[in-house]
């Protein structure tokens, strides 16, 4: 596999002028994370219509934006209304453009947009408060955030990874991998390894590493359990 890709770092945006009632706090002050907990409800009600709802089979993957939305000092002050608004907007934008998106990827992306190369635990926790709880789904295949109008049970599409872009398999929702497996087996495949390799090709990956094989094994097992893949001897065929 190719090395993990890191988003191109862009200089952090210059901090905007602060309202008269938002005087700077000392940098050493603790972050009042609890004050942003109610925002999750607001973010849920304001989640816009997601383009993923119309995604079909083999649509090209589009990553969430990485352009700056604020400065480092601002992310350390989530009690400011202007900062809360920008965090909420960045979270919503990522879900709309890239959803389903891995929760940890979503959080890291928003932290990076405030100028940080590394997403420290305390800053991840701040951003986490803004992710709508009802859009998060966690199972044995990972924790992902879904657009509000995309039914993960009914969705049959998947996104192909553009050449040269590294998209780790563990950052792809299990439902999306299963959809790709089903598509790869539409005309039948002669064995399990061929099914895995054909599916990896959709995500611009050629090496079947142990990590990739383990994740694909879980997805194949689940696809069989859901009746989406049918075993024929040592091979597989799509049930749809």
Regions inferred by a protein language model and the residue ranges of each:
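C-terminal non-catalytic scaffold/interaction domains in large multidomain proteins
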Residues: 18-240
